Structure formats: structure tokens, C-alpha cells
Amino acid sequence: MQEATIAIQIVYMPMLFLSGATIPAAMLPGWAQTLAQFMPASYLVTGFQGIFFRNQNLWDNAAAVGALLVTMVLGTFLAMQLFRWEKEEKIRPRKKLWVLAVLAPFAITGCYQAYSKENIGKNEGLFRDLQRSETYLIRNVRIFTGDGRVMESGGVLVQNGKIAEIYDGATPDPLKLKAEVVEGQGKTLLPGLIDAHVHLGGPAGISSAPEDYDAQKTMPRAAAALLYSGVTAARSVGDGLDASLKLRNAIDAGSRLGARISVCGPMFTAENGHGTEFVEHLPAAIKETVKAQLVRTPKTPEEARRQVRELKTAGVDCVKAILEAGWGDGMLFDRLDLLLVRSVAEEARTQHLPLAIHTGDARDVADAVEIGASSVEHGSWRDEIPDRLFERMAQQGVYLDPTLTVAEAYAQYFAGKADALSSSLVQQVVPARILQGTRAFVDSGKGLEPAKAELFQKAFTQARADLLRAWKAGVPLVMGTDSGNPLVFHGPSMHHELQLWVQAGIPVAVALQAATVNNAKLLGIAARTGAIRKGLDADLLLVDGNPFEDISATERISLVVFKGERIHRAGLFDKK
């Protein structure tokens, strides 16, 4: 019995710590979390936490229930095989082999979990719930609520991941609120920014490392870079379907930390239309597989409708179509037939999916508005959008997303410039090898194309002018960056877009509203985020200074809050 007691203690104590029964398993090193997957106690602890903290049922925790039953049955069986009435009684070697047989199910389960990391992800989500349950008061801070209102001094109480109260002026005693204090003197509190136009799979720069072009790795890092930069939500408008859905679901479950993602999935375009060039030069062995993830090229209205329904079934949040013929040398594309675009739009409305339409000139914009787009992406980069078309957009409530940053970035890229690389925020979020590779490529002159630089500079100038006219005409505005394209880095580009809007003549409050409340409405998440309003998720950005005096203050980030969790920004890139 003494030997048995010692053996039990040797096994029991590691199980107690590794299972998460004493400290959250998510706080353990990665190797320890993986080792814990071979212990049935890990699933029991995770299961009970899911039931108590997330109000889950037994079916939601089938793995934990199974682990408990298997442990009971096999443990009883093993005890019977190894039972001895007397200490001196010998156990036959054959019976000792039952120990290995009993451990086999746990070895198999552990190997699967070590590979899939499903239970590890659930542990991280539960730990995140714990972090988001804190109560704290941000006080003595300037508050922009998102809808244009500014409180020069006030406070926000965050509780259980939500905005519990908003105080205009003096705040209550934090001791009575049982709240920790976050001092906001000299700072401004904004709703978390939202980027309405991103390509998470694009690295935005040049690298010699293949992993920097692997969407399974670049997309999670892009979501982390967005959150690091105070962008708490984004709309993916042209990324691999499976990878983007997987990332969105992991972030929603709390098993991965990053900006919440709205997924449009593959882009609807013509057979040789814009978007297909990204897969044109891929090896034949993978070309069709990648193409199926990135684009849809319907040939008939029936096929277009079916493809929209399939995307809805897959779980997308929106749909994107491209209505663009291109311009200039080497940038001409087939334009998607209007009958097919109309079919996409009609089915998207039936499926309650917002439709974003990429446009290139005023004709494209007119067709997009007539067809019923929810948002016009880019607007016209080649000619002026007529006043009557802006009037119609205002009447129909069609959003304009001008994406000034990407037009400026291409103009610089083809001119042999890379001003974005000097941004402090860019240097913080972009891997060093991409910064170095991009700088080396630009300095080499290999990307220098003066004719294209001139075209994009004209496009940028036209887009700026149309933005100002659209605002004056009452067109609802949203803000996106087209990040993932060259020199348009995920996260920092949103702050640059704000600066470009203000430089174009847009009032700061209007620009900030486009980047928060309006974007939330477009993405269909306004009931959860996008504003500083009681009851919404606490997605917040605290910055040093006053953006209404200097819009670049949004880059001076003091604190990022996501669903109530105060983000440890430096740790966002630790997870591989």
C-alpha cells in the first residue's frame, strides 16, 4: 500500500497542475499544454469549466464526458486485473500488459489533440473569458462615442466584457464600483477602429521566406497586427475561403486573439477578370485548388446564384463582386457580365448577405448602384463620378469606400518610394525580414515603372476629390484600406487612411465615424460593436493626445481593449 500511495502521488501532482485544475492550462508553456492532452483529467477540467462558465451542456462537452466514462471503465478494469490480496502475491506478466492496453485510448486521443489542438484552443478560450470578466474604470478621458459626439472629460466602466456605464463628467468612486482604475488624463478614448477592406493573406511586402506567403500563417498574423494597431474588426474581401472561415471562428471562440473578421470569401469575377491574375502563374498541380478558394467565375445566372447559396451555406458574412475592366498597359481585364453581377446581387439579397462591388471608373460605379450594391469599393480612379450619381447613392444609402491608401501606395511603389516603411507602427507589426526585403526591392529599382506611377498618382488625386464631393453630397461613407497590397500593411494603414481623409478635407469626426459606427453598420455588427454605447462589447482604443487637433494621435496607442480584455499587445505575435 505504501508503494501504491507513493506512485499515486507521483502521478497525481503533475496531473493536478497540467490538467488546469490549479492554474489555467492556457498559462502553461506550449509543450506542457500538449503533454496535458494525454491526461484524461485535462478533458474533465475543460468540460466542467465549459459547463460552469459558458453554460454549455453535456453534448457540447462530449469529449470530456467520454474521457470520464473511459476513465471509469478502464480504471475499474485495470484495478481488477492488478488487484492482489497480499503484498507478496505475484502479478502475472500478462496482466501487467493490460496497463499498456488501458493507456492506448488516451495515447490515441492525446496524439490527435496534440495535432488538432482543439482542446488547447478551448482552454485558451476559457482563459480569455476569465480575462474578459474583469471590472475596470477608464476615467478623466476625452471620449468620442462614434456617432459624432465628444465628451471632453468622462469615464467608461467596463464589466464582463461589456460597456457597463458611460459617465459624462465626474465618475463614481471606483471602490464603490469595485473597479480597477485606468487613468485617462490627456488621452482620448475611441471605439475600436474597423477596416472595411482587407486581404488578410497578402503580406504587403517582399520576403525571401516562403512562410510569409503561406495564408495559414500570414492570415492569423494579419489579424493580430490589426488588433495590435487598435483595429478591432475587419472585413476580408478576397481571401481563401477555408482559411478565412477557420480564422474567424477561432477568434470568435477565443482560441486565437485577433481582430474579429467578417468574411466575404472568394471574389466573383470574369474568367480572365481582375482577381484571376493572382493564380494565373501558379503550378498546374495547385492552380485549380487555389482558384476555388479565391475566386468564383460563373458562366450563367443559375450558376452565379448557386455559388452564392453555396457560400452562404459555408458560412460567409458578405459577398464581393468585381466590376472592373482595368486601364493602362498590362492592367486590362475582362469585365464580369452585368447579367451575372445582377444574379449575384439578387441571390445575395435573398440570402441576406451584403454585397460589396469593386469598381474602377464612373461607369462601374453607376452599374453597381443600379444593381443594388451595399458598398462601392474604390469608386472611380479614372474619371469623375457625376453629381447625379452621388445623389442616387445618398438616396439609396449605398456606402462609398474610397481606399485612398492603396492608390497612394501603388503610386509610390511604382515610383521607387516606400514612405510607409518609416512608420513607427509599421516597424512594430511587420516582421523584420519583410521590412528588409521590401526596402531592398524598392531601393533596387526593380519595381520602378514611371508610367504606372503616374496613373496611380492620378487615381489617388481623383479618389481624394471624389471623397470630398461624396461627403458634401450626403453619401454614407465607410473606411477601408485594401491592406495586404504592396506597402499597405495590416493595421497601421488604417491610421494612415484616417490621415489621408483629413488631408482631403473630411472633418475628423466624420472620418472617425466612418471608421467605427458606419463600418459596423455595413458589416452588420453594429448591435455588438463600433461605438461607445452601454451594452456593446468593450472594443476600445485609448490614445495619447487629441485626434481632433492632430489626427496622427490615433497612432500613439496607449491601450487596446477587445471584448473587455486589455490586450497585451507585445504578446500578440508570440503564438506560432
Tell what function each PLM region has:
Residues 1-14, 22-23, 81-97:
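A structural motif at transmembrane helix-loop-helix junctions in multipass membrane proteins
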Residues 16-74, 82-89:
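Membrane-interfacial helix-loop-helix junctions in multi-pass membrane proteins
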Residues 69-118:
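Junction motif at the cytosolic side of a transmembrane helix
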Residues 124-130, 143-155, 168-171, 461, ...:
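Acidic, glycine-enriched loop/beta-strand segments at the rims
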Residues 148-190:
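Histidine-rich, glycine-flanked metal-binding segment
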Residues 188-255, 271-276, 339, 363-365, ...:
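Metal-associated gating/positioning segment near the N- to mid-region
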Residues 219-244, 258-266, 316-326, 354, ...:
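Divalent metal-dependent hydrolysis catalytic cores, especially in the metallo-beta-lactamase
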Residues 294-295, 299-336, 380-504:
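Active-site neighborhoods of metal-dependent hydrolases
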